[in-house]
């Protein structure tokens, strides 16, 4: 009854107007699953590879080749298989690809099918996706990391860090956390406007004001938290995504906006000072993806009091994560389904992290769609944290809205992670 009888891939648009892959899976009993694949702007060198067309169409970014793979090779390989055999289906696709980085079939083709299969199987089981994937213990609503000021690769301003985030750790529910974030977001917008800055939003819905450095951005956020009636550090904590790989050149961290260069030790000490001066509880990619020595120094320096998240460092890859655990590097992993390219491998990365005492943060990409799968996966894995952009753009708010629905559906079983999500608080 849950055998796969049809798979349809198509080319749709993501939130940046670039093509991406969407996949429909139909089962023998009529159950249906649909998934759309996200795409990143700042990508790690060790990520699974998307299949893009090249040429002039869509400026080379078309995905007709990936769609052809979905409708051809992948359908031929898994047609008739039981959709409830997720691990077997994912492994079949990984083996069919045969490469280390999914470069033959394309991670965008494989992931679209993997997620759509899970959704179809969930529908066949009569269960919401978070319950189907996570089982009876899936009940923790994640603390959102809300990206409200953008810099780096996500903005055209002098700020070298990519994201400045707020975390409503003092809220009592996801519904209340979203309200906290919205009120700070709109307060920040007014304060930026009053100070003469533009308030256009970037790829992830955050503002991209022309501020001179990270401290200026943090000061604006601190003032906005207080003006909105909240206590920084108590109601709302702060987070950074440095995306340090983007400005790591010849062994140093080159801050073009500030016209400063810091060696790895100076970079770590700079981050430590920021975490001391502001209620910063999480720092993502504070060091470059292959600067293992710098990562180790940073972890030894502040890893006992600040969550240090590996994104480009780990790329949702369990093997790289195990290397980090062995070396004592970072203490958290950012989880992006398209970095690794299948649902099974994503779940394995979260499990590997949790077994080692590392936290996990479910995450979107800067190129998103209205697909809200990651909201369900955040609850399914009980990871307790989600990063899905600001309080603007429907491709971001779709995930918050889905979390609100899940919380309502869970009723008294629902628990908002709050401060407990960050083990060091």
From Swiss-Prot:
Its EC number is 4.2.1.11. This is Enolase. One of its GO terms (molecular function) is magnesium ion binding. It catalyses: (2R)-2-phosphoglycerate = phosphoenolpyruvate + H2O. Signal peptide: none annotated. PANTHER family: ENOLASE. GO terms for biological process: glycolytic process. Pfam families: Enolase_C, Enolase_N. Pathway: Carbohydrate degradation; glycolysis; pyruvate from D-glyceraldehyde 3-phosphate: step 4/5.
């Amino acid at each position: 009854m849950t055998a796969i009888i049809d798979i349809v891939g198509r080319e749709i648009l993501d939130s940046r107007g670039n093509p991406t892959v969407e996949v429909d899976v139909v089962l023998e009993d009529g159950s249906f699953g649909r998934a759309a694949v996200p795409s990143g702007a700042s990508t790690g060198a060790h990520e699974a590879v998307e299949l893009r067309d090249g040429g002039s169409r869509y400026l080379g970014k078309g995905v007709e080749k990936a769609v052809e793979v979905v409708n051809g090779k992948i359908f031929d390989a898994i047609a008739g298989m039981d959709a409830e055999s997720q691990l077997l289906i994912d492994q079949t696709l990984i083996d069919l690809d045969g490469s280390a980085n999914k470069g033959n079939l394309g991670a965008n083709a494989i992931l679209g099918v993997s997620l759509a299969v899970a959704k179809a199987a969930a529908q066949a089981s009569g269960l919401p996706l978070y319950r189907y994937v996570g089982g009876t213990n899936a009940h923790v609503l994640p603390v959102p990391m809300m990206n409200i000021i953008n810099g780096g690769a996500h903005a055209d301003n002098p700020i070298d860090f990519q994201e400045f985030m707020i975390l409503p750790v003092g809220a009592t529910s996801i519904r209340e956390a979203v309200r906290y974030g919205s009120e700070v977001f709109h307060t920040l917008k007014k304060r930026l406007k009053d100070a003469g800055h533009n308030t256009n939003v970037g790829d992830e819905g955050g503002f991209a004001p022309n501020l001179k450095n990270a401290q200026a951005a943090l000061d604006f956020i601190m003032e906005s938290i207080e003006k909105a009636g909240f206590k920084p550090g108590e109601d709302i904590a702060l987070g950074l995504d440095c995306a340090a790989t983007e400005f790591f050149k010849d062994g140093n961290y080159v801050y073009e906006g500030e016209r400063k260069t810091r060696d790895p030790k100076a970079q770590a000490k700079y981050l430590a000072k920021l975490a001391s001066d502001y209620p910063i509880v999480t720092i993502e990619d504070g060091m470059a993806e292959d600067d293992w020595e710098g990562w180790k120094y940073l972890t030894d320096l502040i890893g006992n009091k600040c969550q240090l998240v590996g994104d480009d460092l780990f790329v949702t890859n369990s093997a790289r994560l195990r290397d980090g655990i062995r070396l004592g590097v970072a203490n958290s992993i950012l989880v992006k389904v398209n970095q690794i390219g299948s649902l099974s491998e994503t779940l394995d990365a979260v499990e590997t992290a949790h077994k080692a005492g590392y936290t996990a943060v479910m995450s979107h990409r800067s190129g998103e769609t209205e697909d809200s799968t990651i909201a369900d996966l955040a609850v399914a894995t009980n990871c307790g944290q989600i990063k899905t952009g600001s309080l603007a753009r429907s491709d971001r708010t779709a995930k918050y809205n889905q979390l609100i629905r899940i919380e309502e559906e869970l009723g008294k079983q629902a628990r908002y992670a709050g401060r407990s999500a960050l083990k060091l608080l």
